[in-house]
Amino acid sequence: PRRRTRRASRPVRRRRPRRVSRRRRARRRR
């Protein structure tokens, strides 16, 4: 039997990074 990996149990949708200004990116970073 195949082992269940955490990634398989929790599928994540690949998001395409939108064009973000560097200022906004820096501000977004915590």
Curated annotation (Swiss-Prot):
Residues 1-30 are annotated as: Disordered. The keyword Nucleus applies. Coiled coil: none annotated. Signal peptide: none annotated. GO terms for cellular component: nucleosome; nucleus. It is found in: Nucleus; Chromosome. This is Protamine-YII.
